[in-house]
């Protein structure tokens, strides 16, 4: 089994992302996380991970806005080092229906759920320089269990 050394987990401050970050740290992998507004949760996972003796870095970035993912990834690389494991976990899911939605909600879903993983993966592959790496994209059960209440999601 390939042993990864440095991971980036988007949406890594809470829920599944925090669990993934903690698990990777228990495996001895240095962890960087991206979070949006969950600073309290970020500090909680930071304490847990740092108690394991691995390197931890957190990067606040709101993917829902027009984010320059190239600059974000370069910042992560500069502080944390080259990443060999990328977990695209960040997600947003706003309630809307086809009749009650907006460009703002639609753009937020596209930016966080599509653009962020796509462009972070692009940057990840470019920095690998012929080394092996792994990208894991976390998706929601709503991909198969569609409802009319999260239309743009």
Per-region residue spans from a language model:
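The beta1-alpha1 cofactor-binding region of Rossmann-like NAD(H)/NADP(H)-dependent oxidoreductases
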Residues: 39, 59-71, 103
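Conserved glycine-rich cofactor-binding loop
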Residues: 13-15
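Substrate-binding pocket helix/loop in short-chain dehydrogenase/reductase
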Residues: 97-98, 102-110
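Conserved glycine-rich Rossmann-like NAD(P)H-binding loop of the short-chain dehydrogenase/reductase
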Residues: 29-42
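Catalytic loop of short-chain dehydrogenase/reductase
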Residues: 134-153
């Amino acid at each position: 089994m390939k042993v990864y050394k440095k991971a980036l987990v988007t949406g890594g401050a809470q829920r599944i992302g925090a669990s993934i970050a903690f698990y990777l740290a228990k495996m001895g992998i240095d962890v960087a996380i991206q979070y949006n507004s969950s600073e309290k949760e970020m500090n909680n996972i930071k304490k847990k991970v740092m108690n394991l003796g691995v390197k931890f870095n957190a990067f606040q970035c709101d993917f829902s806005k027009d984010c320059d993912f190239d600059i974000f990834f370069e910042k992560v690389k500069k502080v944390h080092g080259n990443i060999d494991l990328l977990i695209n976990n960040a997600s947003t899911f706003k309630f809307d229906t086809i009749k009650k939605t907006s460009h703002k909600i639609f753009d937020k879903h596209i930016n966080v759920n599509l653009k962020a993983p796509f462009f972070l993966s692009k940057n990840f592959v470019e920095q690998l320089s012929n080394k092996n790496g792994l990208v894991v994209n976390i998706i929601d059960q709503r991909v198969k269990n569609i409802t009319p209440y999260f239309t743009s999601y």
